[in-house]
Amino acid sequence: GVIVQSGNDAAVVIAEGISGTEDNFAAEMNMTAAKLGMKNTTFTNSTGWPDPELTTTAHDLALLSTAIIKNFPANKFPELYPIFKKKTYTLNGIKQGNRNPLLYGKSSQSKGVDGLKTGYTSESGYGLVASAERGGQRVIMVLNGMNSKKERSAESRRLLDFIFREYKNYEFFKSGEVIDKAEVWLGDVHHVSLV
């Protein structure tokens, strides 16, 4: 319900099940947000529904998305992350469709898309936090302020195609690889490695 269909009722049930109350859950979300470096985010509920004190930014949502993607395979429930890319989900005989427009359409446009979440509020419009991986390159895109589902769909496709067409990852050095040495004046050693 929460991931595929954006079920706010399911979000509240999960929050209350984990933390007892939605307020307690929001407090835990804020602690996690701080640990992730989400400096411009204050959660007040589990759904993201408008609240004068609820704030976040596209950058902070990208930080959260990165943490979700990095931590799912390593945690004890690796089977959960693939749910983000399910087009439909059936529970108790009720079939629910995923609202992420990037999962649908030509296979070239949806290639590598594996998440994450759509949203809508009257204040911020239609939004999407999307994730895709092609050829070993991972892209996380945060889009907000669209006027309709149709505009969200078209703009997210346009941006994702542009990003994969125009941006590439280049590895100049491997992590931990010694690039050079620097001289140390008056030290116990004469040189230190630059990595």
Name every feature range the model reports, one short phrase each.
Residues G1, A11-G20, T47-E53, T118, ...:
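Second-shell loop/turn segments in exported
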Residues G1, G17, T32, I83-K87:
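Short acidic/histidine-centered micro-motifs embedded in hydrophobic/aromatic stretches
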Residues G1-V4, F25-A27:
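Signal peptide-directed extracytoplasmic domains
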Residues Q5, D9:
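Active-site-proximal cofactor/substrate-binding loop regions of enzyme domains
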Residues A11-V13, T44, P82-I83, F172:
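Short, hydrophobic secondary-structure boundary micro-motifs
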Residues A15-A67:
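Mid-domain, small-residue-enriched loop/turn segments at the edges of structured enzyme/sensor domains
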Residues M38-K39, E53-T55, H59-V195:
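Domain-terminus/edge residues, biased toward the C-terminal soluble/receptor-binding domains
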